[in-house]
């Protein structure tokens, strides 16, 4: 194809059309024309290729927990369906922002796990696959079983994978322990040496746009009440031991003003001020080292649980707090 970014070109061309409905119609027509051209070129090139491999491209466009979830999905596909897998990471250079367009996301997978190998799709591969083999819904395992080529844009639930499978594929301790220093190293030692350490993750940031916030009826007061209830329930569960709570959050000022100020004086807690704010995987590693955990919403705390090796762990979450 003559032009590398037809989406951008089409948007520029249709912008001169004043009426939105007609502008959208023309955009769809031009996209259909470009897609047809890609298909024709692909068929010609594919027929001329002798050893071309079929593969699946997985779109990486998430925070760190989402990146890990998609990596594990890719490994599962390779192990169970004998497919080649590549990853499209172009989103991090094009946008890389959260839902509210405030927090910058980084592709940190290889910074955290330096011992894994992943194939990055080229811009040309991404453009072709996105236009010809794009799927954002359906049974992806069935698609992988029956399709030679796929571009997968979806968000796999990390809880759908077996904990032992994740720990087999990724060794977070081997990759991160030697990188701990200063405050992070002190916190790690305190967490692992305390007989009743409890990691508490409080998701903020784009929480109002996060679907999981619906469990709290999108209400900060209900959200705060849950945190207090979970803390005091954990204290009861761990008696006669006295737990120490280690708080992690992407908005610690909110936690200080809305949680710490209202905790009973007998609650022993500390907040975790990451030495490297951009490297969120250190928070995940520290959380995974605690004896017990309290979840709020999102995949971050769930993924930390996947790396936790305590066989007697107590986990409190919005799903189970009323049944414990």
Segment roles from a protein language model:
Residues 1-36:
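Boundary detector for helix-to-coil junctions that initiate low-complexity/charged tails
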Residues 9, 66-69, 73, 226, ...:
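Conserved alpha-helical elements of sugar-nucleotide-dependent glycosyltransferases
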Residues 38-90:
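N-terminal pre-catalytic "stem/leader" segment of glycosyltransferase-like enzymes
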Residues 39, 50, 54, 94-242:
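Secretory-pathway luminal glycosyltransferase catalytic domains
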Residues 62-65, 90-95, 156-160, 203-207, ...:
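Short, solvent-exposed loop/turn segments at secondary-structure junctions
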Residues 64, 238-321:
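Donor-binding and catalytic core of enzymes assembling or modifying cell-surface/extracellular glycoconjugates
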Residues 69, 96-101, 210-212, 255-260, ...:
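A short acidic (Asp/Glu
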Residues 87-89, 199-202, 244-249:
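Short beta-strand segments
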